[in-house]
């Protein structure tokens, strides 16, 4: 049996923390950076006005708000890590479905776009509500404020980088 010093939770950047921060950076850079910009440009290109764009974005956010307390209530039964992976799957699945909406016409297209965005943000809600409790279990109490600080700094930094990338992408592919 190893000593207390061998416990990975005694290390600030242990494997779980590194994996979490990497996933958080990818999610923040893509979802809050590139995806946010490209989604609105995509909807404009499809001919939708600001009212529909507001509806689509609002539907995603309300689904996030609904999913968060439900996921939080289920965390003890299902587990933080598993729920975070389920949430990431929702983000990937919903954002992957979004572009296929361009193949439809009329109401079907609008419903597809709103529902796929809602799936994306439902997944985000499930992920984000479980991330801090997950992080609490990855390090000892005296390191938690440092890990939370790193986590908090990761989101806007990655979102900023993703926004820059998202702003350049249309020019590269137009």
Predicted regions and their residues:
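Helix-loop boundary and gating motifs at the non-cytosolic
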Residues: 4-62
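Residue-level signature of mid-helix packing/kink "hotspots" within the transmembrane helices
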Residues: 61-69, 159-160
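Helix-to-loop junctions at the C-terminal end of transmembrane segments
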Residues: 67-80
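C-terminal ends and interior cores of transmembrane alpha-helices
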Residues: 89-107
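Cytoplasmic helix-loop-helix junction between adjacent transmembrane helices
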Residues: 116-155
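Transmembrane alpha-helix termini and helix-breaking/packing motifs in multi-pass membrane transporters
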Residues: 161-174
């Amino acid at each position: 049996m190893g000593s207390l010093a061998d416990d990975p939770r005694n290390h600030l950047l242990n494997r779980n923390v590194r994996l979490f921060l990497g996933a958080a950076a990818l999610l923040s850079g893509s979802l809050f950076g590139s995806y946010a910009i490209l989604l609105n440009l995509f909807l404009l290109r499809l001919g939708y006005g600001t009212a529909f764009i507001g509806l689509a974005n609002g539907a995603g956010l309300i689904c996030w708000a609904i999913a968060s307390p439900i996921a939080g209530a289920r965390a003890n039964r299902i587990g933080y890590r598993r729920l975070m992976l389920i949430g990431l799957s929702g983000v990937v699945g919903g954002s992957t479905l979004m572009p296929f909406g361009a193949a439809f016409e009329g109401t079907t297209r609008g419903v597809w776009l709103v529902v796929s965005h809602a799936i994306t943000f439902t997944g985000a809600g499930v992920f984000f509500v479980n991330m801090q409790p997950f992080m609490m279990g990855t390090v000892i109490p005296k390191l938690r404020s440092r890990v939370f600080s790193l986590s908090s700094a990761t989101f806007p930094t990655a979102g900023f980088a993703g926004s820059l990338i998202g702003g350049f992408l249309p020019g590269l592919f137009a």
